[in-house]
Amino acid sequence: MNQLLQEKRDAEQFLRLIAPKYMGVYILNRSTDRFRDVLAPEAFRAYAKVSEGSYSDAMRLYRDEYVSCDYREVIDQVLDYDYVYNVLASGNQVDVSYRKKDGTLIRLKISRYSDSDENLSVWVYTN
């Protein structure tokens, strides 16, 4: 039990160290549109609460508030889960970038979570 607690503390410390580079890390189940956040800003967690746990609805709220108008199509494209699934099923990753209204460039990389569950994917946002 003590080792498990220490491993949890180590993981939390590691996340704190790398957090400035990572804007968010999510595990998404495309079949349910539900997600787990590994690392998320409080604003996104609030959107998730308002959207009752729907990742796509929370992302649309985020898009409308933060994403520059010229890049909203990028968000819409990745919210097409069939498109994302087809890219991942072909052995590739989805790798897109968009700008926030404040000019910050955000990179989103989407990968398969595992080979055993085709519905799960990892969404990593970096700046």
Task: Please provide the spans of the model-predicted regions.
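Extracellular Ig-like/FN3 beta-sandwich strand-entry sites
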Residues: 91-93
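Interdomain signal-transducing alpha-helical coiled-coil linkers
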Residues: 1-12
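Generic recognition of flexible, low-complexity loop/linker segments
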Residues: 11-15, 25, 83-85, 95, ...
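Conserved acidic
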Residues: 1, 126-127
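Short loop/turn elements at sensory-signaling interfaces that couple input to output
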Residues: 108-126
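PAS-family sensory domains
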Residues: 95-103
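PAS-family sensory domain signal
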Residues: 13-66, 112-114
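PAS/GAF/H-NOX family sensory domains and closely associated sensor/linker modules
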Residues: 55, 59-78, 83-88
